[in-house]
Swiss-Prot record:
Pfam families hit by this protein: Urease_beta (PF00699), Urease_gamma (PF00547)
Coiled coil: none
Region feature Urease gamma, mapped onto this chain: 1-101
Molecular function via GO: nickel cation binding; urease activity
Name the record gives this protein: Urease subunit gamma/beta
Main location per the UniProt record: cytoplasm
Reaction(s) this enzyme catalyzes, per UniProt: urea + 2 H2O + H(+) = hydrogencarbonate + 2 NH4(+)
Amino acid sequence: MRLTPTERDRLLLFGAAELARARRARGLRLNVPEATALIADTVCEAARDGRRLAEAIAAARAVLGPDDVLPGVADIVTEVHVEAVFDDGSRLAVVTDPIGGGLGDQAPGALLPGPEHTEPEAVVRVLVTNTATVPVSVTSHFHFFEANPRLDFDRAAAYGMRAAVPAGSSVRFGPGESVEIGLVPVGGDRIAIGFAGLVDGPLDAPGAKEEALRRAAACGYLGVEQR
């Protein structure tokens, strides 16, 4: 018997669903693969019977309840996608909340958000002007002193500082745009390596700031002169 890959997948799904039916008949509560297979197979069989997409999805939602599955399964299987062949062609059926009765935040292993992190208040505010013809973005933990050379701001005031924005975010400066931004000191060991190469070591080492300003001036950075 020659089968297409789609037909082989259908037989695999049917086999898993039959196993789920047999275990359910023995009084066992289904796990995630078993529940998923049974729900998906119900859609495919409804399509084979000539039922429409909405009817197939409704049948899949009715096949299992919270008491038919192991604890936590309803919170894991929140959506099942399966491609089934209907009378008018192949359709992707999306069965949302197929089991119902999920415990939400009370489910075993649920991920709960921690307390909201409050960013520190800015200790320095500088006016930044983007003189470039393209937008410039600076990420939260970039040493702001070493930001794009075409950004015009008080570099000396920004030495050892980063943008006072949430971690992982960035601040964007449009072409010709002037924006006042708050800065906070770089934390931790205060060692800057990489970035634009203006600093390569401890930020607070003797002479480090003066050397960084000299390098910035030599490389044509705007805003090197303290205003």
